[in-house]
């Protein structure tokens, strides 16, 4: 009986350990080629003309989008007069940020789910992507708030991001990766850790925009990173159940799509857009990850592998 009881206990412990492992999936960091990554280069004015009607059509089909947008419009009307905004920044851009940062509903999650999976083809985007106007307004808001030039205009933002439900791991140091969605981060490490520790990111972003003044939750001191920014993996370690990832922006974006709503087809490669003053094209040399050890690369001494296939 003692042996049977012991075997039963061991069996339960094994099942519990297996459940814990499966409860936090491991996802590889990559260039996520199926992300819808349009940056609307050269067509932002035409998209501004079309996005208003497009938004009305999409709100008619999506109740949560309509409710969230209308609530954010009201909040923006009270917030707007307190803000100093860049030239070209319109009410729709501010409302889009307030819609995204309102985590009291699931719309931000639904948007990012669509972004991560909606870039298989232009046909897929046109038929099934339900947030075309919101994606445009949010992308444009970040471009206007951040300004052109990336880190050639300044050192960028050092930010942190905590994830509680997923383990993200790079394949190797020196890889180029994208986050593949609109990614919330904070300049305050303590704030970021409140969102989880399964994976903890340390990042330097050149295209993420500080949105604290526009956010529904300004105390989070948020910097919002666009889906198409390219990062260099400079560090990875595991501390028990926690993965710690260090990403250093290469001061570059890349996109498979450009002006898709206006007819632009998906391109085979991820076409890079370099910021002014960016270093020359990088070497493909990289170091392999070693399990259980902390590996770090000095981003000033390592060049990035090509962003597109």
From Swiss-Prot:
Glycosylation sites: 102, 197
Expression tissues: Abundantly expressed in testis. Lower levels in cardiac and skeletal muscle.
This enzyme's EC code(s): 2.4.2.31
Pfam family, one: ART
Ligand binding (NAD(+)): 100, 161, 181, 215
Listed GO MF terms: NAD+ nucleosidase activity; NAD+-protein-arginine ADP-ribosyltransferase activity; nucleotidyltransferase activity
Keyword list, A-Z: Disulfide bond, Glycoprotein, Glycosyltransferase, Membrane, NAD, NADP, Nucleotidyltransferase, Secreted, Signal, Transferase
Similarity-based family: Belongs to the Arg-specific ADP-ribosyltransferase family.
Protein name: Ecto-ADP-ribosyltransferase 5
Gene it is expressed from: Art5
């Amino acid at each position: 009986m003692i042996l049977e009881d012991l075997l039963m206990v061991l069996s339960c412990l094994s099942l519990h350990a297996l459940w814990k492992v499966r409860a936090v999936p491991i996802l590889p960091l990559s260039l996520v080629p199926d992300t819808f990554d349009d940056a609307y280069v050269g067509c932002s004015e035409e998209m501004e003309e079309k996005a208003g009607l497009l938004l009305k059509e999409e709100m008619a089909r999506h109740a949560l989008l309509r409710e969230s947008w209308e609530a954010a419009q009201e909040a923006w009307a009270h917030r707007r007069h307190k803000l100093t905004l860049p030239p070209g920044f319109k009410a729709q851009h501010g409302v889009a940020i307030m819609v995204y940062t309102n985590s009291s509903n699931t719309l931000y999650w639904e948007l990012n789910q669509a972004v991560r999976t909606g870039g298989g083809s232009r046909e897929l985007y046109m038929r099934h992507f339900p947030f075309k106007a919101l994606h445009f307004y949010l992308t444009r808001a970040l471009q206007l708030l951040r300004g052109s030039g990336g880190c050639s205009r300044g050192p960028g933002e050092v930010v942190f991001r905590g994830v509680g439900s997923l383990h993200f791991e790079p394949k190797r140091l020196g890889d180029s990766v994208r986050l593949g969605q609109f990614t919330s981060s904070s300049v305050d490490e303590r704030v970021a850790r409140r969102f989880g520790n399964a994976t903890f990111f340390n990042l330097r972003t050149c295209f993420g925009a500080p949105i604290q003044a526009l956010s529904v939750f300004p105390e989070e001191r948020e910097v919002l990173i666009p889906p198409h920014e390219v990062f260099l993996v400079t560090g990875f370690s595991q501390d028990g159940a926690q993965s710690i990832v260090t990403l250093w922006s290469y001061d570059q974006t890349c996109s498979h799509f450009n002006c898709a709503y206006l007819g632009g087809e998906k391109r085979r490669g991820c076409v890079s857009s370099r910021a002014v003053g960016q270093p020359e094209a990088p070497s493909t040399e990289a170091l392999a990850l070693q399990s259980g050890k902390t590996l770090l690369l000095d981003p000033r001494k390592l060049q990035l592998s090509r962003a597109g296939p």
